[in-house]
Regions:
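Hydrophobic/aromatic beta-strand patches that form the interior of the parallel beta-sheet core
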Residues: 38, 154, 222-226, 302-306
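Short active-site oxyanion
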Residues: 33-36, 196, 301
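Acidic, Ser/Thr-rich peripheral helices and adjacent loops at domain boundaries
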Residues: 237-279
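C-terminal helical/tail subdomains of lipid-metabolizing enzymes
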Residues: 115, 122, 126, 130, ...
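Active-site-proximal substrate-binding core of FAD-dependent oxidoreductases
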Residues: 229-230, 237, 355-356, 360
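Active-site gating loop/helix substructures
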Residues: 112-218, 225, 232, 237-245, ...
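Patatin-like phospholipase
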Residues: 2-9, 14-125, 129, 135, ...
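Solvent-exposed loop/turn segments at secondary-structure junctions
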Residues: 15, 230-231
Length: 374
């Protein structure tokens, strides 16, 4: 028995999003295609590239995007010079910070400090007009809006401070919705859609699983969540490692918290269904009982959490380090993680999951290991 819904969740993470692209290629190799893709920030860009292309071109389009925005900083270092790699990566990140990333963003000229208050130029360091052009070339928005695969993009309303999802279920998606989902301040300016200003959804939460939880009915689903930041790590030994560890925790902490709460909600829902089943007939029609029944709908969910746990050689600049070597390594890591773990979770059927939420974490700790479903 297959799952009624195959859902792919993609976090934010800048350059780390190449790992997500590799995971998607691994899923394609295994014959898994999502029916719904939810993304935030770079995850929104990857999501649009997936949903906005026919299945046979999706990996090709992802590769083209990541090739365009990665920078060749020179020939690969020989093994005996590998100790220089962190310095080379840092130089690549400084290039991204000072001159921008081709096909993605560029520094504002004149600089923001010379812009008049209230203008778009005064609200960010960089201009994402190049990303708009890239998206409109590589993404078929007519295909997205036909709704064959559902697409949801997380952003935050700047003035209201609330999370918003642009969803093909009720919204016609265009390139500005994707830019809004990735408009992380103060680097990128808010994007105006229908008179409202939107920033990167990661300002509120970097993990879009809470949006899926609110979907009803969704009784039967396999949810593949791809995390770009790892909540677990060693104790920092210098200031650079402090900055990296703080960033990892900041952008990953809600991921585990949300999944733990979802499992607890599943357990409470099962208890609620048991209690409702023992109510006398006269009480089952009570409004409070009916409200409880609606909140305790039966769900058979398998959540696969794939995390790039490999140590970074880019340190605290890893999310804006776009050297081609690093991008390729992240992509390969994503493919390998699917290949190495899929035998442990691909055959877990809805019947085995039962009426509850189970989580499988094949890449959560180092070294890589396969972990049984919880």
């Amino acid at each position: 028995m297959k799952y009624d819904h195959e859902i792919l969740l993609l976090q934010g993470g800048g350059a780390l999003g190449a790992y997500q692209a590799g995971v998607y290629e691994g899923l394609v190799e295994a014959g898994i295609e999502p029916s719904w893709v939810v993304g935030i920030s770079i995850g929104a860009i990857n999501a649009a590239l997936i949903v906005g292309n026919p299945p046979e071109r999706r990996v090709e389009r992802l590769r083209e995007f990541w090739r365009r925005i990665s920078v060749n900083v020179g020939p690969p270092l020989p093994a005996w010079l590998d100790s220089l790699r962190p310095a080379v990566n840092y130089m690549a990140a400084m290039s991204a910070a000072t001159v921008g990333v081709p096909g993605f963003y560029r520094p504002r000229m004149p600089p923001t400090s010379f812009a008049m208050d209230g203008t778009e130029a005064a609200l960010s360091v960089y201009d994402t007009t190049p990303l708009k052009a890239t998206l409109e070339e590589l993404v078929d928005f007519d295909l997205i809006n036909r709704g064959q695969v559902r697409l949801s993009l997380g952003a935050v309303n700047v003035c209201k401070g609330t999370s918003v999802y642009f969803d093909t279920k009720n919204t016609r998606i265009h390139s500005d919705h994707i830019r809004a989902s990735g408009a992380l301040p103060p680097g990128f300016a808010p994007v105006i859609i229908d008179g409202e200003h939107y920033w990167d959804g990661g300002v509120v939460t970097n993990t879009p699983i809470t949006y899926v939880v609110d979907e009803r009915p969704l009784p039967n689903a396999r949810i593949i969540q791809v995390d770009t930041f790892n909540a677990e790590g060693d104790l920092p030994r210098n200031l650079g490692q402090v900055l990296q560890r703080a960033k990892d925790i900041q952008y990953s902490s809600k991921s585990r918290f949300n999944i733990d709460r979802i499992q607890e909600m599943g357990e409470l829902a099962a208890a609620g269904r048991g209690l409702l089943g023992r109510l006398p007939p006269g009480l089952k029609s009570d409004p409070d009982a009916q409200k409880l029944a609606a909140a305790c709908d039966e769900r058979s969910w398998l959540i696969i959490r794939l995390i790039n746990t490999r140590p970074s050689r880019s340190g605290f600049v890893k999310d804006f380090e776009f050297s081609r070597a690093t991008i390729e390594e992240a992509w390969v890591a994503g493919v390998e993680d699917v290949r190495r773990s899929i035998s442990g979770w691909d055959k877990i059927s809805p019947k085995e999951v039962g009426p509850e939420v189970k989580v499988y974490r094949p890449t959560e700790t180092l070294p890589f290991h396969n972990q049984a479903a919880e």
